Every structure is written in C-alpha cells, then in structure tokens.
Regions:
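Short, well-ordered alpha-helical segments
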Residues: 12, 55-58, 107
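A solvent-exposed, acidic/Ser-Thr-rich amphipathic alpha-helical stretch
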Residues: 31, 35-88
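Charged/polar, solvent-exposed surface patches and flexible loops
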Residues: 13, 17, 32, 59-66, ...
Length: 147
C-alpha cells in the first residue's frame, strides 16, 4: 500500500506543478512536464481546436503569451482533486484570470491529466474550458483586428 500512497502523492504533485508551470506563462514552462509524445485535447469539440502534439501545442500557446499579462491559474479546491492511481489520471477544476489589451479575461477549466508510470510526467491532457468565455475573447480579438 505504501507504493500506492507514494504514487498518489506524486500524481497530485505533478498536477499542482503543472498549474505552477501555467502560471509562469512561458512556452518552455508549459511544455516542461509533458512527454515528447504528449497529446493535448481541447474540449468542447465545438470550439474546433484540434488535438495537438507537444510541439504543436507550444506553437498554439505561444500565440497567447504576448497577448495576456498578470496571468494566474489556481486549483479551486485541492480536496476535490480526483486522483486515480490505477489509471494514473488526475482530474482538477481550476480558474484562470489574465489581463489583455481587450480587458480582463477569466475562465474556468476542468483538466484530465494522464501521467507516466512513475507519475512524474504528463502523457495526455484533456482541457475543458467555459467555451462561451473563450469565444467571447476570440470575437473581441477579431473585432479589434478588423477595426
């Protein structure tokens, strides 16, 4: 049972480290805990964002690094974090906030992270956001570009 408890603690630490990396708001930091074969899926699928490889996600994420400042992401309640040792998955609910030239941006996310066997790296990411907030930001960006 000690191995089970240790792996659970490692999975939880990797998940919280992932959020810490998001708060550094650099491409290198956001990619640092991903395996080379890590896939990143955005949901809902109605957003039309494809599943990205690690390299593709770095390019996608890099588009937003200069757009936002004072970014912060936080786990809403660590007690509500779901850690499944057998499947090496962690599910967590987060809230994010950032400043943009178009005003403040806030959103909510559910993350499903699948880790490596030792729990120290991320093999797969499913990110589910409040799509209305994401679409609102994109519409503001497009309006500014067309103005």
């Amino acid at each position: 049972m000690a191995d089970h408890s240790a792996l659970r603690a490692t999975l939880k630490k990797t998940a919280t480290d992932f959020i810490d990396c998001c708060n550094k708001y650099t491409v290198d930091a956001v990619l640092s805990l991903r395996t080379d074969t890590c896939k990143h899926t955005h949901l809902p699928s109605s957003l039309g964002i494809p599943t990205y490889s690690k390299t593709e996600y770095g390019a996608f994420y890099g588009q937003y690094v200069g757009l936002m400042s004072d970014c912060s992401c936080r786990i809403v309640d660590e007690k509500e974090m779901v850690v499944d040792v057998e499947s090496r998955k962690v599910v967590m609910y987060t809230k994010a906030k950032a400043n943009t030239p178009l005003g403040e941006y806030e959103n909510e996310y559910m993350w499903i992270l699948t880790m490596t066997g030792d729990g120290k790296m991320i093999e797969d990411i499913v990110e589910f956001c409040d799509s209305a907030k994401a679409v609102e930001l994109v519409k503001k960006q497009q309006a500014q570009m067309n103005a």
